[in-house]
Amino acid sequence: MSSLKIHALADVQSKNIGEGTQVWQFAIILEGAQIGKNCNINCHTFIENSVKIGDRVTVKSGVFIWDGIEIANDVFLGPN
């Protein structure tokens, strides 16, 4: 049984999302994005194709992450 939780109103095109990660409503994650284990992707976020996100990362509401960005483990990304 998977511990991955994706809200019904999220648009998640990627299959590369780790166990224990939660994706909230209105998040958009494009097909090529890679997201690690136990992450928290909040509402109204946008994650492009070549983004790589490590384990235990929190992406708060309203954060956009563009192609080419790599985020290490244990990072907190807050809005402006």
Regions found by a protein language model. Give the residues of each.
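Structural signal for interior beta-strand "rungs" in well-ordered beta-sheet cores
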Residues: 4-78
